[in-house]
């Protein structure tokens, strides 16, 4: 079954594994992909989610130095060929005009055989970008009959009126969303509840939301997540740092606890928003 069909079947669980393209020092694409293949053979994964890494000036100094990496669509095609699992390629759409952006997307679909894309906006609303907004890009993709693409978007649960943004993106062609990394359940519970209410009012079906989790193993990982804008409660951060020797274990425990709290709320309140998991590999960032 194609990822597109899995995403659109509300009762079917969907799990994505998010990993960065390899750095130059990680060796060849083939050897890196083979390592990933060995890792993923031990579990069930529906898709490999590949982010696009860019320097983000507005966030301040990056706690972990950015390094030159392979192009996401090239890495995605190789993984599809070697691992046999569909790739989702993230694309920041704001940095070139709509014509150039659509050319890139068409090439990604036809030449690299990528059928799943997450459209990503700019890092700051205060910056004027030369390219389209996420909704403009989604609309252009949906109007292009030559494309065979499943489009998704990013969700930031702590952002004001985020449920309204999900509706707008859905109306422009987004069929699923991946959230920012979660270390607390309150904002995502609030967002999903509001999203369900808005969908009911509009008599439309909610799109799938992939809940993102990124277990950490060091204080450097925590600093990087916070630089990305991830909200980690102070109590949770203290618990992780004070138990640095078993941070990975503690982090996994927190992740499971947050997920169970979300699932319990959805079940108790009969919320029908289909969810899934997006597990991020933070160790090599």
Residue ranges, per PLM feature:
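Residue-level detection of beta-strand scaffold positions
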Residues: 47, 176-178
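Active-site beta->alpha loop and helix N-cap motifs at the rims of alpha/beta catalytic domains
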Residues: 1-161, 244, 250-253, 260, ...
């Amino acid at each position: 079954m194609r990822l597109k069909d899995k995403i659109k079947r509300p009762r079917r669980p969907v799990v994505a594994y998010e990993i960065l393209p390899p750095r130059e020092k990680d060796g060849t694409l083939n050897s890196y992909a083979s390592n990933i293949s060995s890792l993923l053979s031990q579990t069930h994964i529906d898709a490999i989610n590949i982010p696009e890494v860019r320097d983000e000036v507005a966030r301040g100094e990056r706690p972990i130095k950015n390094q030159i990496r392979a192009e996401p669509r090239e890495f995605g095609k190789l993984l599809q060929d070697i691992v046999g699992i569909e790739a989702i390629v993230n694309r920041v759409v704001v940095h070139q005009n709509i014509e150039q952006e659509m050319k890139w997307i068409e090439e990604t679909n036809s030449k690299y055989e990528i059928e799943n894309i997450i459209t990503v906006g700019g890092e700051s609303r205060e910056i004027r970008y030369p390219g389209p907004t996420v909704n403009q890009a989604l609309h252009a993709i949906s109007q292009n009959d030559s494309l065979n693409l499943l489009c998704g978007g990013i969700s930031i649960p702590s952002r004001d009126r985020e449920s309204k943004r999900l509706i707008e993106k859905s109306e422009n062609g987004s069929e699923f969303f991946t959230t920012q990394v979660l270390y607390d359940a309150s904002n995502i519970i609030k967002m999903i509840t509001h999203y369900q209410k808005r969908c009911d009012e509009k008599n439309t079906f909610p799109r799938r939301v992939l809940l993102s989790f990124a277990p950490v193993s060091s204080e450097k990982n925590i600093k990087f997540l916070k630089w990305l804008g991830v909200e980690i409660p102070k109590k949770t951060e203290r618990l992780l740092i004070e138990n640095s020797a078993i941070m990975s274990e503690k982090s996994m425990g927190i992740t499971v606890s947050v997920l169970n709290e979300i699932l319990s709320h959805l079940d108790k309140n009969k919320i029908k928003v289909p969810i899934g998991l997006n597990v991020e590999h933070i160790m090599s960032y």
